[in-house]
Structure formats: C-alpha cells, structure tokens
A protein has these predicted regions:
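Nucleotide/pyrophosphate-binding catalytic subdomain
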Residues: 1-257, 262
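Short, glycine-/Ser/Thr-/acidic-enriched flexible segments
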Residues: 8-9, 39-40, 183-184, 199, ...
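Short phosphate-binding/catalytic loops that engage adenosine nucleotides
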Residues: 136, 270, 336
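Structural preference for solvent-exposed beta-strand-turn elements
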Residues: 206-212, 267, 274, 347-351
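Short hydrophobic alpha-helical runs that function as membrane-insertion/retention elements
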Residues: 214-218, 272-274, 339
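A conserved active-site cap/scaffold subdomain adjacent to cofactor or substrate pockets
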Residues: 242-289, 293-312, 320
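A conserved regulatory-domain signal marking ACT and ACT-like small-molecule sensing domains
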Residues: 284-374
Length: 374
C-alpha cells in the first residue's frame, strides 16, 4: 500500500485534476490511498466566510456563492452537462449555508472546524466523481469516519488506537482509496481539524495504520529546497534528508512538510518522498532513516508575522519554574505555538505564532499576574 497526498496547488483547476489521474495511472491504481486537500485557496476563502459571518455581515453568503462558482466552473470543464456532480456540489454548499444559519455555538474554534472542513469535502467529492468518470475503480472513504480525535478544535489531538482500528476496518488493501486530508471527528462526531496544512499529517496517519511502503507528497516545487524560493534566490534541491533534519526544518517553518507528519513515519521507518506534480518523473526529495543531508548545504527559514511577548514580575520577584509552568499552560490553552524563549531572573520573553488569532485573550489573562509587553 502506498499513500499519495495532493495539496491545494495540485488540485487548483481542471487541468490539475486531469494530471492527478495521469500520475495515478502511471503508478498503478491498486493498493493506493489518495489524500486530497481543499482546492487552490478554498481554505482561505472559507476563513473569509467565517470572518464575515462572525461579524454578522451577510456578505458571507456572497463569498459562499463565489466558492460555489469556482468549483462549479471546474466541474463544467470536467463533466458533461446534467452529470450528478452538479447537484451533489449544490447539496454540499446548501449544507454549509444551513449550518451557519442554524449555528448557536459561540465557540469560534468549533465553528471554524465545521466551516473550513467543507473545502476538503467538496474537493474529494469532485475528484472522486472524476475518477469514476475516467473509469477508475475507487473506494471513497470519509476521513471523519476513520480519524478520531479529542475536542481541541483547530489543532485536534489524535486518538491513535481508535483511528488505527477504524482505518484497518474500512480500507481494502487492494483498492484505490480517496479520502480527505486535514479533517477528522471527535467522540460526538463533530468535525475537527488537525491544524492548518494538516493534510500531510493525514497521509502519515493512514500510512502508519496500514504499514504503507511509502508516502509521496505532491507539490508545486521539485522537492524540499534549502530555502523558500519566494524569499531566497538560487535555492537548491535537497536530494535526501533524514527524518530528524526534516522535522526540525518543518517545525521551524519549512512549509513544504507539516511538522507532525514525520513522527508516525519515523516510528515505522516509512520513507517519505516530496515530488513535483508538474514533473512527476523527477526523483524529488527522499526522507528516511539514516539519510545524511545531500547536498550538504545550509538551510534557511524565514518566519513572518511572529509576536514577541515580554513578561516581567509585577512585584520584582523572580520568574521561577512555577511561573514558567503557568505561562506555558496559558500558551497551550490559548493555542499559541511557541517558537523561541528566553528567561532571566525577573523576566521571560517568548516568541509565539498568533495563527489562531487569540493574542488579545491571552494577554488579558497574563496581565493578571505579570507586566506584559507586546
């Protein structure tokens, strides 16, 4: 069993979806799991929908219409008129609108997961329909029936035991499987998400549960580069790299691989390949046990939009272990990933990522115990 993951850029239009079919045919359609992200920038578009919705701005409905039009155009390029994919797409969009109109929850993270997950639900529905149109025998699996998590919305933690059991029960080893990345569900069957760009992690979860022979992430770059080509000039391809080096690069911001992807693969020594969907015959980058970085060159990472918090004691007392423990517990509660820390006798500085936009809440709580500068 192999696992392929196709990200948003690799399913951004009808030509990209046709390309996926060609890639799959070239590798063989048996014993293959295809994990798919939302198409192009759909996740961003759904985040914009949510932002307007939470402001009671009815313009959110127009944004949903734009999402529908984008996907409808792709379908018109791929399918004949009167194909049932068109009514199916409308039904999915109707469910999204219905959820938002009937939602009573004030929990932003809960509403986020129920809303943004529609990107993956739409993309897999369209792509599976196209596979069938192209006479590929597929087995469609809703990832929410397999990947079970806790209630930590937007960055849910996996229930490994139950997830493995579900995957083994639902996946037929000799078939072509298509499923969603990024999403799962909790014990109450509410949709959860695994963190932004979490489809890589989904692929690793399926690979781990099924003892896959490999995972391939298909990207719009030739593999893992030694720097972001949007920031640095003359970047070079890393032909091979170890799990350890890859996870360090991913943790500190190399966006080509999701940070959580490597751990489950490393446990079972499942190799990871990062390849270009635009040039699939090229070898890309191989990530596996014991590989030394090749070529042996420096790697560069730039992380934008970071926030530096400086905390100091109100009464000039020392910042001790108890204080630091409290600070970290609050960072966890308010979903603030930590990038760097520095402490001294009476101060503590921490660089955090405000990707969940809860900085104001966090600062308000911390100011009850510390002087806080942002």
């Amino acid at each position: 069993m192999k696992v392929f993951k196709f990200g948003g850029a690799s399913v951004k239009n009808s030509d990209s979806i046709r390309n996926i079919v060609e890639i799959i045919r070239s590798y063989g359609t048996n014993e293959l799991i295809v994990v798919v992200s939302a198409m192009d920038k759909t996740t961003n578009a759904l985040e914009n929908v949510l932002e307007l919705y939470l402001k009671n701005n009815q313009e959110y409905l127009k944004k949903i219409d734009q999402i529908f039009i984008f996907h409808d155009k792709i379908c018109r390029d791929l399918f004949p008129k009167n194909h049932n994919v068109f009514s199916g797409l409308k039904n999915i969009i109707t469910k999204l609108v219905s959820f938002l109109k009937n939602n009573k929850s004030p929990n932003y993270s809960f509403v986020y997961d129920q809303t943004v997950s529609y990107g993956e639900l739409i993309s897999t529905f369209i792509i599976n329909s196209y596979f069938i149109e192209e006479k590929l025998k597929t087995n469609f699996i809703d990832a929410r029936n397999c990947i079970k998590t806790d209630d930590y919305y937007r960055a849910a933690n996996l229930n490994w035991e139950l997830t493995q059991k579900n995957i083994k029960q639902q996946v037929e080893n000799d078939s072509l499987i298509i499923t969603q990345g990024f999403i799962g569900s909790n014990s109450n069957n509410f949709t959860t998400t695994l963190g932004r760009e979490g489809s890589d992690y989904s692929a690793a979860i399926f690979a781990y549960a099924l003892n896959a022979t490999s995972v391939t992430i298909w990207k719009d770059v030739p593999g893992v580069l030694n720097g972001d080509p949007r920031v640095f000039q003359n970047t070079q391809l890393l032909n091979q790299i170890s799990y350890r080096e890859a996870i360090e690069l991913a943790f500190y911001g190399a966006s080509v691989i999701h940070p959580k992807t490597l751990q489950p693969l490393q446990r079972k020594e499942i190799p990871l390949y990062v390849k270009s969907f635009e040039n699939p015959i090229k070898p890309g980058t191989a990530v596996s046990k014991g590989k030394t970085i090749e070529p042996n060159i420096p790697c560069y990472i730039v992380k934008k939009n970071q926030v530096l918090l400086r905390l100091s004691s109100i009464d000039f007392s020392f910042i001790v272990e108890e204080n630091i423990s409290y600070i970290f517990s609050m960072l966890h509660e308010y979903q603030m990933p930590v990038e760097l820390i520095q402490n001294s006798a009476i101060s503590f500085s921490v660089c955090v990522n405000n990707k969940y936009k809860r900085l104001e809440e966090l600062v308000l709580v911390l100011r009850s115990k510390f002087n806080v500068e942002v």
